[in-house]
UniProtKB/Swiss-Prot annotation:
UniProt-listed CDD domains: MFS_NRT2_like (cd17341)
Protein's recorded name: Probable nitrate transporter NarT
Organism this protein belongs to: Staphylococcus haemolyticus (strain JCSC1435)
UniProt GO cellular component terms: plasma membrane
Higher taxonomy: Bacteria, Bacillati, Bacillota, Bacilli, Bacillales
Pfam entry (one): MFS_1
BP GO terms, sorted: nitrate assimilation
Length: 385
């Protein structure tokens, strides 16, 4: 299993994920600056913030499958080359339509998540997969990097130049992956149709997809809507809002490998049930909060639970679907990405309908309860003997 290469490839792929997520999430933290030059209404804003998630979710299935066919090296390399185009186009954007188009293709940066979660387990023994995938998942910190750094840099050199600077970083990592990516990565050539046929009859795939829809969806959604939400609802300064959003993302990211470790040492489903109970409480807190202090407590609770939950779920995926890991990773991670697409739209709709976003957070709690019920069913069926 090429374990001797594991540490190096894990590091390279994790850093590549950081860069991919930096590009994927670049619009949201810069939107307070972009909106000064490009006029957008609330409806357009919610679409612009959510649209990178569409392609970033849909492509996760073919990217996971392709990783098993041609290896992570070439999927990462081609993705970085493709990303150069929407980044360049975004730097020239002058209309909402241009923002939407560039944002759509920035989704490639989010889709590469399924590359590593398919490739990395090949280099490690089963009792280390949870930790390894958790470390790889820390590449999500790329979202926080953009949240922390993009706003203050944009305040100095302008948002267009800030966006264009990403071209250099992406080009460097395309070169690094071309040179150092593992061309001898073990391949798994199981026909996609047969994988889907086997997966479609396994209820665990649907449960894991629902759980990740909530945990990773919360991670993505909060990262997308928090900067503008904090500015518009609490009067927070643009840079401060970016920092607060970055803290949410960083906390969830650094706790992801802890979730993987907990999944390696204990029953991952049981730990996940506890995690979701706390997440439900956090969602209820957000649903009743009207003060920044209470809202912060709710956000931090969601961040902690989302991070741990992400790590726990991707401990379970390879253990349940060893031979269909590429397709399973792609489907589950796709659902997680889609989980980040809907909340910003729901929040905008609910706020316009009721004058408050509180109901949207209560809906998160309801989804958490539904997921908890399915966890109880799986635990009873698989472990309670």
């Amino acid at each position: 299993m090429y374990k001797t290469k594991g540490g190096f490839q894990l590091t390279l792929q994790t850093l590549s994920l950081v860069v991919g997520f930096m590009a994927w999430s670049i619009i949201s933290p810069l939107m307070p600056y972009i909106s000064q030059d490009v006029k957008v209404n609330p409806g357009q804003l919610s679409i612009i913030l959510a649209i990178p998630v569409i392609l970033g979710s849909i492509l996760r299935v073919p990217f996971g499958y392709l990783t098993n066919i041609i290896g992570a090296k070439w999927v990462f390399f081609c993705s970085f080359v493709i990303l150069l185009f929407p980044i360049f186009f975004l730097g020239q954007a002058q209309t909402p339509g241009m923002l939407m188009l560039s944002g759509f293709f920035l989704g490639v940066g989010g889709a590469i998540f399924s590359v590593g979660v398919t490739s990395v387990p090949k280099y490690f023994s089963k009792d280390k997969v949870g930790l390894a995938n958790g470390i790889y998942g820390m590449g999500n910190i790329g979202t926080a990097v953009s949240s922390f750094l993009a706003p203050p840099i944009a305040g100095i050199i302008g948002w267009q130049t800030t966006v264009r600077s990403y071209l250099i970083i992406i080009a460097i990592f395309a070169i690094l992956m071309f040179i150092f990516g593992d061309k001898n990565e073990p391949k798994v050539k199981v026909p996609l149709a047969s994988q889907f046929k086997k997966l479609s009859s396994n209820y665990k795939l649907y449960y894991l997809s629902l759980w990740y829809f909530i945990t990773f969806g919360a991670f993505v959604a909060f990262g997308l809507f928090l900067p503008n939400y904090l500015v518009n609802n609490f009067g927070i300064d643009k840079v401060d809002a970016g920092i607060r959003s970055g803290v949410f993302i960083a906390l969830a990211t650094f706790l992801r490998p802890i979730g993987g470790i907990l999944g390696d040492k204990f029953n991952a489903v049981k730990v996940l049930m506890i995690d979701f109970i706390i997440m439900i409480v956090g969602a209820v807190i957000l649903g009743i909060s009207s003060h920044i202090a209470l809202f912060t407590i709710g956000c931090l609770t969601i961040s902690i639970c989302a991070g741990l939950g992400n790590g726990l779920i991707f401990k379970l995926v390879p253990s349940y679907f060893a031979k269909e890991s590429g397709a399973a990773n792609g489907i589950v991670s796709m659902m997680g990405g889609l989980g980040g697409f809907f909340p910003p739209l729901v929040i905008t709709y609910v706020t316009g309908l009721t004058g408050s976003s509180h109901l949207a957070f209560i809906l998160l709690a309801i989804f958490g309860v539904l997921a908890f019920i399915t966890m109880g069913h799986l635990y009873k069926k698989e472990y309670a003997k």
